[in-house]
Amino acid sequence: LKFLLFLWLIAITLRIGFLAWQWKSLSAFSWEDIAKAFYIGVRFDGRIAAFMSLPLLVFLFTPFLSRFFGNIRPFLLGFYVIAFAFYILIYIADFAHYAYLNSRVNFAAVGLLEDTKEALGMIWQTYPVIKLLLVLVVVVAILTLCAKTILNKWVYAKNALSHKITSAVATLFVLVILIYGQYGIVYYPLRWSEAYFSGYNQITALGLNPIQNLADTRPQNFYVDNTEQARKAYPNTAKYLGVQNPNADSIRYDRFSQTAGVGDKPNIVIIVIESMSTHKSSLMFDELDTTRFLKQLSTESLYFPNYYASARTTARAMFSIITGIPDVNEYFKTSSRDPYTMDQNLVWNNFDGYTKLYMIGGNANWANIRGVMSNNISGLTIYDEGYWKSPRMDVWGISDHDLLQEANVLLETQKEPFISLIQLASFHTPFTVPDGIADLDYTIPNDEYLAKYAFDSKQEYLALKFCDYALKKFFESAKKSSYYDNTIFIITGDHGMSEVSPSVEATYSNLSLHEFQVPLIIHSSKYFPQAKIMKQTGGHIDIFPTAAGLAGVKVHNTTMGRDLLDPSFGEDRFTFIRRLNRPPLLVSNEYCFSNEYEQAGGGTLYKRASKDSTNTESTKWELVEGQDSELYLKLKTINEDLWQSAIYMLYHNAKAKANEVTNPTHTK
């Protein structure tokens, strides 16, 4: 029992450490919520402690094994040395994961290790690995010494049989309660969803245990068919998407269209900037000088301030952009890694007569993105490491500046109209910035200023300025090229960032909007000479349908993406956002519906305080009175229906099935 309590105390101590570390953000919440979350977390800690103590208890209280306990003890101690090492290693990873993503470590993080070279390289270049290993060794040594002391007392104790029986019964009783996780008369065991009672990420994080969370978020090895849920959701989804011939029996989302376009086969260049979070840019705060060029470019372009990544992490964001389906995959680590979602009918394929290009400074094998594109995009040419002449800068390959300069040279050589997707990576840990660039402003403000805008380090701030600089130099070069005049540039970020900025309203962060809001800029001095702020809301799934509309190509769209410039949808449209470990969001220019687990009330409706979406007040969202209103119920239904439809689309968007519909001889 002492050993069990010892293990429990370790976890509680680490939880207190997490509470102290995050107190600045947690102190904004009520004591009641903090206490409840801490109590739930302590119960999770007790469960993990109980499971960890099982090997010892089996040897102690099994009659034919206990007599050999003295001989078994060294091997048992060796087992716990290994267990302690993994235990502390998980907590180190958990704290690092939370520092970067504001969420406790989950199985999606394990998926990142599949790209072993990049993952280990990033860890080595970002974190003080040697110091952390020393901490690991010291902590494990201390825990092992304490465990050895407790085990020695048991070996040399001369207890009567009755005492051992009493101890065994008491320990078994405590063990059952701790594993069950409920310290009262409750007819179901402690479940992960109880930690989500508040609807706030910070409170939820306090209530979770990283080991339990890894187990709860592990991918399923099977797909749970949701056909019936998708069929029920179909009428609303079909109406929302504008399906021309809805058929609930076939559950098809086919839409056929062709706009006049803006010109004769304009080139399309899509640039996706790593972690280009709106709330860390000059686009939201004039005082910030992180993205001065991007700010200037927005005043010469179509600028969409109400634009959001459809999902978090780069792999999910890029899958959403490429396919037009929000990556809501909960059965595998990400859809790009799921063999059952590899066959997709893409709008990108509708660009007949276009040269299709994908460029990245590192290796295109990351997260199996190469597989997604090669399998689904006819005639695509991928340019990645090994092709570029510039030297490798860090784990992510060549720098954004070098990638964009070489991309410009490559685009200049194209003989046919082209559509190119360029993926940048410099604004990512370890935030490497080359030294000695003559016209790069290396000025970094003081720590107080950095904290005000949620920059964790001076290097992060400088890396964002370098990214903006790289973009500026690219446009300077592109304007001298032969392709520039007939090219439409679409610029966005893959996702936002997790750090909560004191400069935005609390509700904005509580809804996790800071993790998803990114800029969208459509630039063409020829086709859009007049700048305009586009108030309609959009998301990553809309990029290729919008590009197709601009190019005037014939489109067969079977996904959730829509043309942002299609006037038939109007300004009052919603975009769907898949959140990490929380139900999805539905956001418009005016409203935000936050779906939540039932423990957190089932959902909440907010209204933006300021309709001026470029104003800093745009991050202020106010609770709407009458949460049972017609609007609330409507948005809750749309949210649920789009969620089910997105899951269904992931597994039922095969190219062959889409081709059947386009075949003139095909009859429904």
How would you label these PLM feature ranges?
Residues L26-S30, L101-N106, E118, W124-V129, ...:
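General structural signal for secondary-structure boundaries
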Residues G242-K668:
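Solvent-exposed soluble domains appended to multi-pass membrane proteins
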Residues I10, L113-K117, L208-I211, T227-A230, ...:
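Alpha-helix initiation and N-capping motif
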Residues L1-V224:
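Transmembrane and membrane-interface helices of multi-pass
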Residues G70-N71, N226-P235, K333-P339, G561-R562:
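Short alpha-helical "patches" and their helix-cap loops
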Residues E114-G121, Q125, L151-Y156, Y234-A238, ...:
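Short, highly charged low-complexity linear segments
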Residues R67-I72, Y80-A83, Y100, H163, ...:
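A broad, low-specificity signal for short, low-complexity segments enriched in glycine/proline
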Residues D115, G199-I203, G207-S257, D264-K265, ...:
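The feature marks either
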